């Protein structure tokens, strides 16, 4: 899980979602693409 000021999709399988006011990226194909804004 990377924590970044600006989260971006890194591949076409990445999805941007918002949970409890926190923007996250989840990726089914590449778990290393997981990110959280903060």
Swiss-Prot record:
* Homology family: Belongs to the bacterial ribosomal protein bL36 family.
User: What's the gene?
Assistant: rpmJ
Question: Which HAMAP family does UniProt cross-reference here?
Answer: Ribosomal_bL36
Q: What InterPro entries does the database record attribute to this sequence?
A: Ribosomal_bL36, Ribosomal_bL36_sp
What name has this protein been given in UniProt? Large ribosomal subunit protein bL36A
Q: Entry's NCBIfam families?
A: rpmJ_bact
Q: Which domain of life is it from?
A: Bacteria
- A GO term for molecular function: structural constituent of ribosome
Q: Name one GO biological process term.
A: translation
Q: Which GO terms describe its cellular component?
A: cytoplasm; ribonucleoprotein complex; ribosome
Pfam families with a match to the protein in the record: Ribosomal_L36 (PF00444)
Mind listing the UniProt keywords for this protein, alphabetically? Ribonucleoprotein, Ribosomal protein
Signal peptide start and end residues? none
Originating organism: Pseudomonas aeruginosa (strain ATCC 15692 / DSM 22644 / CIP 104116 / JCM 14847 / LMG 12228 / 1C / PRS 101 / PAO1)
